[in-house]
Amino acid sequence: AETREVTLVAPLRALLPPALAESDAEWRLSIPLVAVDAADFASAKELHLTQSKYGVRVDLIAASFTRESTALSIRVSSEREGVSPVCVGKRLTPDEVMPRLVNAQGQVYGRKPLDEGGRWLSNPLELPFAFEPVPRDAKQLQFVVPVISVEEPGEATLRVPLAGRRAGDEIQLDTKLHLGQHTLRAESATLERREDGRLDLIVNLDLGPREGDRQLVGLEVAAADTFGSWQSWDGRSGQLSAVSVPMAEGEQEATIKLHKPLIAIYGDWTFDFSVSEQ
């Protein structure tokens, strides 16, 4: 007869201190067995597919297929010194720049939530992606990575005149800055008083349009102490739109050092693979 239940038996002396366990006492746990369809078990295959574009290498390492989802594992690395991959897509990512899984008939499988641990800044960057399950009779799939964001070297210094300025004043700048391979524009700045009485200098930035396969989408403020600073991002363009830095009272000029430009690189990195060999 088919077994429907098993019992796990363990002597208490193996689980408790000797003073608490009777010599012949046992701990028992009944475990019911549930019949499952073979399709509930994951089938997986190693892929080892590689594509390099614009100094960024993407390896499609493996795929697994279950009734609930299709999971893919990728590795992203930079082939240029001083450049590190930061994330797949952009920081504020519209769907069109996120990876997609497509079958031979052009059907796109929706992405599923997945804990993408280790998503930010390592070289190489290893990431899992999950999609809706594919039919068991599927034969060919295509995995497409449209955009990868990398951190490149680069520094720029912005000087903002503050003499005679008070909280609430707007300062017109229209200053061009060269950061790595890209040019950005500091449009204006505003002094704002916080509720706790401290001053913030908010600088509005225009990081510019996409240029070929590249787009400047972000940067960082270089400072010994950035406590209290913040950034604002434009959800439509996926680009940084403003930075804020704390200011001391009576400053005549603010010197803001910008570095670590974040660049979105447009591929596509495309991988075709067979499901039938799983």
PLM feature spans:
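Alpha-helical, hydrophobic structural elements that either
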Residues: 1-278
